């Protein structure tokens, strides 16, 4: 039996005024303004633009780190292409062709950008981007498309509830955005984690596809499916609260800015400012979880005792070694990295959706 919202019948408005009834039916029939294919195109375009803007900054950061303290063979380091972090392992056989091991005498970020572009070519600023985009692009597309559809569906249900059952309490719209963000992120990380683990193994040990097949079978035989989710728990410890806070904040900031600027608001500017602000808020609140996640993941490839440490033990070790300040270290660099990434990705995603909707 369809609900009044699904059927759209005005006879179920329970005596509400006709204008309110019509508005309620319109609200309950609301659909996404763009199709799934257009969402995929918009998120892909936004992801590419984001990575093109953000990758040079991380390439320079890694080159500066390598210059100060060269990576020992087998050591893990993080590569961030603006969309997601990738655990990279310094190759066991050093080759001059590895981009992060190229010599350089850099005196800072600006100096590094100029020298890399001048002596190695402008394309060197995007070193390592192609292999990481193989993972980041589908993960980002899946994440944004899932979020968008789930968020619209939840908000539609809430709108119907307010219209047809005003006596009942209904959660605010930002809560729908938070739930949709959490669910979408959980699914995306769960799907991507095993593939990312295999990619890291292939990169670090130069394994062939036959050797990868043997590794998968032996891992399944010894530890089961959990062997492919070694970093899942610490990742979700950070990503679940971050996604919830980010999307709730983005929805709130965007709604308030649209209301203040009126119908003539610039959708790109509103999305950019809202995304940047939401990214800052989410980063501040979830930074301790990010530090814990990093400390958990850098143990991968270490001793057996280090790898088998629980999250609780890792937290205790961090507190005993540096006190409460251990959980706030690196906040400013993370804000510099995350806030513009969020702003660029969401603004271009919304902009491309707007273009598709306008053309449609």
Curated annotation (Swiss-Prot):
Cell location: Mitochondrion inner membrane
Coiled-coil parts of chain: none
Gene Ontology CC: mitochondrial inner membrane; mitochondrion
GO biological process, alphabetically ordered: import into the mitochondrion
Primary location recorded for the protein, binned into one broad class: mitochondrion
TM segment ranges: 40-60, 125-145, 178-198, 225-247, 269-289, 327-348
Topology with respect to the bilayer: Multi-pass membrane protein
Keywords: Membrane, Mitochondrion, Mitochondrion inner membrane, Repeat, Transmembrane, Transmembrane helix, Transport
InterPro entries given in the database record: Mitochondrial_sb/sol_carrier, Mt_carrier_dom_sf, Mtm1-like
Family: Belongs to the mitochondrial carrier (TC 2.A.29) family.
Protein name (record): Uncharacterized mitochondrial carrier C16C10.1
Upper classification of the organism: Eukaryota, Metazoa, Ecdysozoa, Nematoda, Chromadorea
